[in-house]
Structures are given as structure tokens and as C-alpha cells.
């Protein structure tokens, strides 16, 4: 096949992203393909500021933060075994996977 497969992983939990990327790398290396990664991409941080009280005390606020962790895995010199290994791989439900061929 000799084409490049790019896999992007996203999750709110960095442990899930790291474990999922390691499982992908192990499965792909077992088929003999060349793997580049996992490459950590910048973390997106969303900060929400909310009033503590519904009526008064404008100065009293809470801040909440939502972090999105991302990893990138590139696979080169793929074969049909590599694609089959990726299809059979089961990842946790908290991980968003984007695959580009």
C-alpha cells in the first residue's frame, strides 16, 4: 500500500490518551509498519467563570477549566495487516479518534 495514515486522538483525560496511543503504536509495530509518535499536541484549555451567588456579590466568582489533551500518530509503509490490526483495536469510550489516509 505504501501510504501514510495519520491518527489524531483527543480526550479530557490525559491518561486515556497516552494509553490509547501506546496501544496503537504496539499494534502497528507488530505488523511491521513504521510509526512516528505519539507526538503530544498543545493542550486546549477552556476557562469558564461563574458567579457563586445567583443574586448578589459580583466579586465572588468560581473558575472552572476544561482541558483537551491531544496526541498525533503517523504510520508509514502500511500493509493490509496494519489496517486489520487498527480495525480490531478497541479503545476506551472517552477517546475521540480521527483517522486520515
Curated annotation (Swiss-Prot):
Family under the similarity heading: Belongs to the universal ribosomal protein uS10 family.
Source domain of life: Bacteria
Annotated PANTHER family: 30S RIBOSOMAL PROTEIN S10 FAMILY MEMBER
Job description of the protein: Involved in the binding of tRNA to the ribosomes.
Ribonucleoprotein recorded as keyword: yes
Record GO terms (molecular function): structural constituent of ribosome; tRNA binding
Entries under InterPro entries matching the protein: Ribosomal_uS10, Ribosomal_uS10_CS, Ribosomal_uS10_dom, Ribosomal_uS10_dom_sf
SMART domains assigned to the protein according to its UniProt record, in alphabetical order: Ribosomal_S10 (SM01403)
A Gene Ontology biological process term: translation
Keyword DNA damage applies: no
High-level lineage: Bacteria, Pseudomonadati, Bacteroidota, Cytophagia, Cytophagales
Keywords, alphabetical: Ribonucleoprotein, Ribosomal protein
Subunit and interaction comment: Part of the 30S ribosomal subunit.
Pfam families to which the protein is assigned, alphabetical: Ribosomal_S10
GO terms under cellular component: ribonucleoprotein complex; ribosome
Protein name: Small ribosomal subunit protein uS10
